Amino acid sequence: MKMLRRTKVNFSKLLYKITKLAIVLTILYIYFTPKIVSRNNASLQHIFPHKYGDYEINLVIAHPDDEVMFFSPIISQLNSYFPRTVPFNIICLSKGNAEGLGETRVRELNESAALLLHNERAVSVQVMDFQDGMDEIWDIDSITSSLSQKIDIKNHNLNQIIVTFDSYGVSNHINHKSCYAAVKKLVDDYAQPKTKRNEQPPHVTALYLRSYKNNIVLKYNSFIWEILKILYDLISPFRRIIQALPPNTAAEKDKLSLMNTHAQYVLAFATMLNAHESQVVWFRYGWWIFSRFVFVNEFDVYTY
């Protein structure tokens, strides 16, 4: 009995300490909102210095709810950074019909887009009819052909931004990986032959979401790592020296890191709960607490 009581007391103390730490980190997260906004704008300015040019944003996903489960940070930041004249296209390769809820999930995707992109921007949601499922192998040539009809990649007067998964697809989901394969084929086919590509300045930017395949700690550390990075920037005795140095563009040009502010995270979570009601099951709450993807997106950047 004494051992049981002692265990309960120790567990209560541990829970109390964890709760206090969570509160402190959340307060810091809110407090650092201006810093987060500044970092996001600097990152986007580095990749897209001429934001008032002719742009079109394209998000290629596999299932309805991918946009909010994995891509809410970049959706929110691109929506804030670019003027409202820049259209935003969400291209979903399936209806998410594995459980017979296809039409419901298409409606939910449209509701989600309306909540996440809540301004006067032109938003297009286009849903294809590939059958989703872990055992469903999609024809990449067919997807690429469909994407080429929806993304005007050959128009050199229009800067195309294409956002999708990387080759691992966050969770190694075969449908997510197909998004990457199709987008990569689309831009690679466009880029050939090289002589043709060199005739025109780059106008296509492909952003592939980093999956952290071999780093499960980073993948599920919520927003903690980013808060620690901000704190380090503030307290490091060498920060003024480092900031005085010219940026290492060779190292940074191929990477884009964006973070939701606390308010944007709350909006994304509310979007999941209200728009994607059919997908709200108990384990999703754990995702919204621990997953890095609902707080931070990091991308490998390629220009063509």
Curated annotation (Swiss-Prot):
Protein family membership: Belongs to the PIGL family.
Top-tier EC class: hydrolase
Function: Involved in the second step of GPI biosynthesis. De-N-acetylation of N-acetylglucosaminyl-phosphatidylinositol.
Cytoplasmic side: 39-304
Cell location: Endoplasmic reticulum membrane
UniProt name for this protein: N-acetylglucosaminyl-phosphatidylinositol de-N-acetylase
Reactions catalysed: a 6-(N-acetyl-alpha-D-glucosaminyl)-1-(1,2-diacyl-sn-glycero-3-phospho)-1D-myo-inositol + H2O = a 6-(alpha-D-glucosaminyl)-1-(1,2-diacyl-sn-glycero-3-phospho)-1D-myo-inositol + acetate
Keywords: Endoplasmic reticulum, GPI-anchor biosynthesis, Hydrolase, Membrane, Transmembrane, Transmembrane helix
Gene field: GPI12
PANTHER family with a match to the protein in the record: N-ACETYLGLUCOSAMINYL-PHOSPHATIDYLINOSITOL DE-N-ACETYLASE, N-ACETYLGLUCOSAMINYL-PHOSPHATIDYLINOSITOL DE-N-ACETYLASE-RELATED
Classification via Pfam families: PIG-L (PF02585)
Superkingdom to which the source organism belongs: Eukaryota
